């Protein structure tokens, strides 16, 4: 991992959709997590929002930086009222969690409505300095309906304020990904 760090790597990504929760506080995960925290890397997680109450506490207790992918994937039916999404919001003041604004289409037919309702809540909970945008390219399973330019245009519809967009597009990722400024 140290070799990867010297090459500019800044984190790992876990796609946990449809997979069991890792036991971050046990054995090899605990050791691996300690190394990731020591390197000041992030752990980007794609998981259904109902899982945040179980996933986040052990990671935050170890001092990990976490990026919740796709607005935290709020439940397609309950949207921003989803208890898992609310649990994600409750971690905003820790300073250890970022949320990636990406892939509204992954929240079903009402995805755009859900993320438009989610953005003000995320902004209030995390501040724009802990929100980053992602194109979600190559849009797996949605290649025929989504393009990088459509994904970028979607951000403009979610985040109306130009200064907030600037922070989300440049300042927050520069800090998270350790880009020189």
Question: Which residues are covered by each model-predicted region?
Answer:
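Catalytic pocket-lining loop regions of alpha/beta-barrel enzymes
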Residues: 11, 25-132
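Active-site glycine-centered loops adjacent to acidic/histidine catalytic or metal-binding residues
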Residues: 136
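Glycine-rich phosphate-binding "P-loop"
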Residues: 4, 8-24, 141
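Short, active-site-adjacent cap segments at secondary-structure transitions
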Residues: 106, 139-141
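Catalytic cores of alpha/beta
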Residues: 1
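Mid-to-C-terminal alpha-helical segments outside catalytic/metal-binding sites
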Residues: 121, 126-132, 141-181
């Amino acid at each position: 991992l140290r070799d990867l760090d010297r090459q500019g790597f800044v984190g790992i990504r876990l796609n946990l959709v449809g997979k069991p929760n890792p036991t971050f506080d046990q054995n090899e995960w605990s050791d691996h997590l300690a190394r990731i925290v020591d390197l000041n890397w992030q752990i980007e997680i794609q998981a259904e929002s109902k899982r945040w109450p179980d996933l986040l506490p052990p990671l935050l207790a170890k001092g990990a930086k976490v990026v919740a992918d796709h607005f935290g994937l709020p439940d397609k039916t309950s949207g921003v009222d989803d208890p898992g999404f609310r649990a994600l919001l409750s971690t905003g003041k820790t300073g250890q969690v970022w949320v990636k604004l990406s892939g509204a289409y992954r929240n079903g037919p009402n995805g755009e409505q859900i993320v438009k309702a989610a953005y003000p809540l995320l902004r209030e909970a995390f501040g724009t300095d802990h929100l980053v945008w992602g194109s979600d390219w190559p849009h797996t399973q949605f290649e025929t309906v989504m393009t990088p330019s459509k994904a970028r245009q979607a951000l403009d519809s979610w985040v109306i304020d130009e200064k907030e967009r600037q922070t989300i597009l440049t300042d927050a990722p520069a800090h998270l990904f350790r880009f020189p400024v």
